[in-house]
Amino acid sequence: MGGFKEVFRQDSKYMAFFISMVTFALAFGLYKGVLDNYLAQVVGMSEFDKGVSEFFRELPGFLLIFFLAVVYTFSAEKIYKLGAVIMVCGMVMQSVVPPVRFLVILAMFIYSLGEHIQLGMRNTLTLEYAKEGRGGIALGMQNSVHQMGMLAGYVIIFAVCFFAGKTTALFKPVFIVSSLILLLGLIFSFRMTGSSETDKAKRRFYFRRKFSKYYMLEVFYGARKQIFFTFGPYVLVLFYGADAMIISLLFAISAVCCFAASPLVGRMIDRFGYKIIMIMDTVILVGVCFLYGFAHHIFPRDVAFVVCCVNYVLDSVISLASMASNVYVKDLSDSSEETRATISTGVSVNHLISILIALFGGWIWHTL
């Protein structure tokens, strides 16, 4: 913990914050590791149903800015705890409701609402607890801890499925365990007794003509994120028959690769500039999408499955290039407040496109 002591203020509640965050990430890893298979194999969701479920799962991300405007008098710690309470409610509901589409989607929406509320506060609290001039490394440590928590969840799901075999009876117990872990994280979060101010820039939309290209980039990133995050794993489950063990292993490999590649991508942005990185990202993405969509026409089925898995991981890695757009905004901004406000608006634009793509993508898959 020596590294943490060098980065964070000793009078802050950074330890309770990080312990709660890693437990929330662990619970998410367990939950996400089985969710796609649960929806396909137990709930019986079709491709279009999956799009509908993702519409409601992403909707809280778009609504977040309105929620923060309502609770603007709350401290960042209080909003973070509120998000944890909502996450617990959503996961408990997922644990007890029967596999009925409406109830399952409602539980997903509630959990996602809490998740997005916390997502909006994590950076604020990290920067608040960091020592002067240590904000960058503090954010990096926060991201690493969160990735490790999710990775642990994926590895646990892989191990359980490996030893228990291919059985759908594991899904509900996983949701129950995730609920208990979330409850533990909630308990730790109650030890965060500070009164950090929320970022005022996150309470309003901020549109300026000079950032029009950035908003268009967020439209692009929101669409590509939703296509791969939502329908990428579902292709592997429905078309190639991947079970929860394979999906959780894929998520784990993806998390490890992103964890390792994130600093490298950051250095490449600094060295070559954001324009070169964004162009490289787009060129590589064209090949990734082509192979993901047409691999089964080019290769034997087993080989095509491996190609799709590799492309899923590759897309996760190259999506890190979206950091370049933040550097682009910083270069154009006249102040740090304008940077934060623009990026926050970009996040809302990103989620708006995500929820529309979820429905449109599901309709296309179902129709074709």
Briefly describe each language-model feature range:
Residues V85-P99, V283-R301:
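C-terminal ends and interior cores of transmembrane alpha-helices
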Residues I157, C161, S179-T198:
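C-terminal membrane-cytosol helix-exit motif in multi-pass small-molecule transporters
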Residues I117-A130, S319-D334:
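Intracellular juxtamembrane helix-capping segments at the cytosolic ends
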Residues G140-F158, V347-I357:
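Glycine-rich segments within core transmembrane alpha-helices of 12-TM secondary carriers
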Residues L63-A76, C161, A261-Y274, G362-H366:
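Helix-to-loop junctions at the C-terminal end of transmembrane segments
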Residues G33-D49, T230-I247, V329-D331, H366:
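Short amphipathic helix-loop junctions that connect adjacent transmembrane helices
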Residues V22, G90, F102-Q118, D302-L320:
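Hydrophobic core of transmembrane alpha-helices in multi-pass small-molecule transporters
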